[in-house]
Amino acid sequence: MIRVLHLAPEAYPLAKVGGLADVVGALPKALRPLGVEAHVLLPWHGGLEARRVGEVAFAFFGREERAPLGERVEGGVRFLLLGVEGFGRERVYGYPDDAERYLRFALAAKEVARGYDLVHAHDWTAALLALYAPTVYTIHNLAHQGLVDPGLFFSWTGLPWSLFHMEALEFYGRVNLMKGGIVFARRVTTVRPSYAEEIQTPEFGMGLDGVLRRHAGKLRGILNGLDTEVFDPGKDPYLPAPYTREDPSGKARAKEVFRERTGLRPPVLAYVGRLDYQKGLDLVLKALPRLLEMGFRLYVQGVGDGGLQEAFLRAEEENPEGVRFLPAYDEAMARLAYAGAEAVLVPSRFEPCGLVQMIASRYGTPPVARAVGGLKDTVEDGRAGVLFETYHPEGLLYGVLRLFRLGAEEMGLRAMEKDFSWEGPARAYREVYREALG
């Protein structure tokens, strides 16, 4: 039995901003039948309830600090929560002191990691663990790298300045935490095989392509799965009625309730996820007047960029019958949108993997997605959804019109046939763990 500690900023069902939470919440369950005992360690975010099971002592800025350790079991997965300073807040990310908060969390986490064979660290917030423990490091999104002033970094962590050079942590005069994860982890994974190749090129490497090429021997690409027990319209507790591909009658009831909750008459286009320019939301805003003219309605749900949030609030005020915006993480409404909208929009600038298109397909709602990254790999264009190439409002409009011309409802039913389970990816991760420990 391999004992693995997953380290991440978010994990479903405790804290969720985007698809990272779904991955971290689901993978441990899929690993259990394969002989891997995996627990998840998160910051003790504001509002999370857990049973206190101990206290962790660690050093930060040359002083000893102590953090309460909580425990909570959900869906058979053991979640541990670290109550370090700075995390009793509403949001997971988006504060000026995020670098300090997550470094403090990582320094406390390394003490918890002593009881495990291996750490599986996710994205920049957990990358520091690669310097302290045997680590598999997963890059979910290369755009967010965790850049820190070197004076602050070495004062906070107590690590030696000898690590501040091009072959270690230095990146254009700053400390790059993601680079540290890549350099010091025993194995590095990304969220699909072709992404592992793409990020070694200047076009997609976000400045780290040279580092990734130098460490290509330990780089693996594993396509993300989907927790098909959690995302199952046949037994989803958030839906007013169950439905399956064989008997989709309950989907009509979901559409009715979605219309009642939002006040939007069909056809409704839905976006669920982070408010981030990476996600192509500027395209949605620019295309919105034309979409409304054509008779479409728009439902947007998510948190993130303040400018985008203001823009969608204004859009709702100016178009009360055509736009509904929910600036919150609300899993019940997200599931209802996946089931009740006529289409789900995924117009990303770039997308390492993406889970929204998988969830929408599982719920029989076809995605309109840009033909990039993981979207291109997982959306069957013209059969179970629609892809568009050009990053322009006209491209998005073309995709939406093409979907409805080809038959959105029929495509949704075909999308439900696709297998996005974690079974295959979990076996691949077990092999990576064995390599890292070998």
UniProtKB/Swiss-Prot annotation:
Keywords of this entry: Glycogen biosynthesis, Glycosyltransferase, Transferase
Gene3D superfamilies on file: Glycogen Phosphorylase B
Name of the top EC class for this enzyme: transferase
Origin: domain of life: Bacteria
InterPro entries: Glyco_trans_1 (IPR001296), GS/SS (IPR011835), Starch_synth_cat_dom (IPR013534)
Catalytic activity field: [(1->4)-alpha-D-glucosyl](n) + ADP-alpha-D-glucose = [(1->4)-alpha-D-glucosyl](n+1) + ADP + H(+)
Pathway the protein contributes to: Glycan biosynthesis; glycogen biosynthesis
Gene Ontology biological process terms, A to Z: glycogen biosynthetic process
Pfam families attached to this UniProt entry: Glyco_transf_5 (PF08323), Glycos_transf_1 (PF00534)
Binding positions for ADP-alpha-D-glucose per the UniProt entry: 16
GO molecular function: alpha-1,4-glucan glucosyltransferase (ADP-glucose donor) activity; alpha-1,4-glucan glucosyltransferase (UDP-glucose donor) activity
Signal peptide: none
Ranges that cross the membrane: none
Enzyme Commission numbers on file: 2.4.1.21
Described purpose of this protein according to its UniProt entry: Synthesizes alpha-1,4-glucan chains using ADP-glucose.
Record family assignment: Belongs to the glycosyltransferase 1 family. Bacterial/plant glycogen synthase subfamily.
Name of the featured protein: Glycogen synthase
Organism annotation: Thermus caldophilus
